[in-house]
Amino acid sequence: KEAYLHPDAAKALLEAHLLLKAQYPSYRLIIYDAARPMSVQKKMWDVVKGTSKYMYVSNPSRGGGLHNYGLAVDISIADSLGHPLPMGTEVDYMDAASHITNEAKLVREGKITQQERENRILLRQVMKSAGFRALPSEWWHFNLCSRDEAKQKYKLIN
């Protein structure tokens, strides 16, 4: 499989990979989604609009999201065998258990384990150190910049 990013995001992602390898040589980053054309964004939005899951997909009529600029990545960490580390939910799980804002509470309630929380924290540490920003509602999603900055400096992928 292939994933595409804007060169600025690809450079930052390589930095995140190197930071992870420096701490955990047997780990690697695993990419689930990267650049996404607006035509695909519209199809995704059509599936969730009018449902309780709409908040997890950027509305294309509002300019879409950072995936549509090649500046966002959905990512996790894999072990030496290529198996994703446990993070408490699957990627694209559209529920509060995916949010990063209340992870301590999720552990207390038994919705995720302490190890899953620590794995999420490790992912955030390497991604943030490389210049990415975490999305509060999705532990796997990272943006290179703000939406306003993307609109000013980059082009949408159609």
Question: Which ranges hold each PLM region?
Answer:
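Cell-envelope/glycan interface and biosynthesis
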Residues: K1-N158
